[in-house]
A protein has these predicted regions:
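Conserved positions within compact, well-structured domain cores
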Residues: 3-5, 13-210
């Protein structure tokens, strides 16, 4: 999974009074993980509330790692998690997004009339200079760790865990959960990618419905 973005032309000054406003403070919030006291920014995109930062909860195992085992990357990118560590890492009241939830977020974000591609709306301005980061999602390119334990793609692409519950085609009973990294951006397009399966990837969460 990789993200390649061509820089946009500099925006011209706008005088139109009907211009879509940037995000307001009311659309942002905070969440404190009571397990370790970490405070996260949150953002609202459509009807969904997302963590606006990568998860940083430390596990008492090797199921979470810092990129290249170098803590200079931690504050910005958080931990990379293995599939085995996901359930323990997620705090109460939040969940790993499904394929449908990622698709819903992407579809809503791309409604912006100024949206060249979804990264121009949800990437951090530090990563993509031309991004408006309108909703405060602030996606960062945290890279991944592959099956050979090699770290790769830092500052180039973002890889996030996604979950799907399999359904028996006959009984329609919900079966095991399937985990994979899900969001792929390339040449201005985006799609769910269930072929990209690194050993460790970043985590963003969606707030449970109230």
């Amino acid at each position: 999974m990789s993200i390649m973005v061509m820089p946009k032309k500099p925006a011209q000054p706008q005088t139109n009074s009907n211009e879509t406003p940037k995000r307001t403070a009311a659309e942002m919030g905070t969440f404190v993980d009571t397990r370790d006291g970490t405070e996260y920014k949150t953002c609202k995109i459509g009807n969904q509330v997302w963590l606006a930062e990568n998860l940083k909860f430390e596990l008492d195992s090797d199921d979470c790692v810092v990129y290249d085992e170098d803590y200079q990357y931690f504050d910005k990118y958080g931990y990379l998690y293995s599939e085995k560590g996901l359930k323990e890492a997620i705090p109460e009241g939040w969940h790993l997004p499904s394929k449908k939830e990622w698709e819903t977020m992407i579809r809503f974000a791309k409604k912006d009339s100024r949206c060249k591609d979804v990264l121009s709306v949800i990437a951090s301005e530090e990563w993509i200079d031309s991004s408006s980061d309108k909703y405060g999602f602030s996606m960062v390119p945290g890279g991944r760790r592959d099956d050979n334990d090699d770290f790769e793609l830092i500052d180039f692409s973002a890889h996030f865990w996604c979950v799907e519950k399999t359904v028996d085609p006959i009984s329609h009973a919900i079966g095991r959960e399937k985990f994979y990294t899900c969001v792929r951006f390339e040449d201005g397009s985006d799609e769910i990618d269930d072929e990209d399966y690194p050993a460790y990837a970043s985590v963003r969460l969606v707030k449970d419905a109230e």
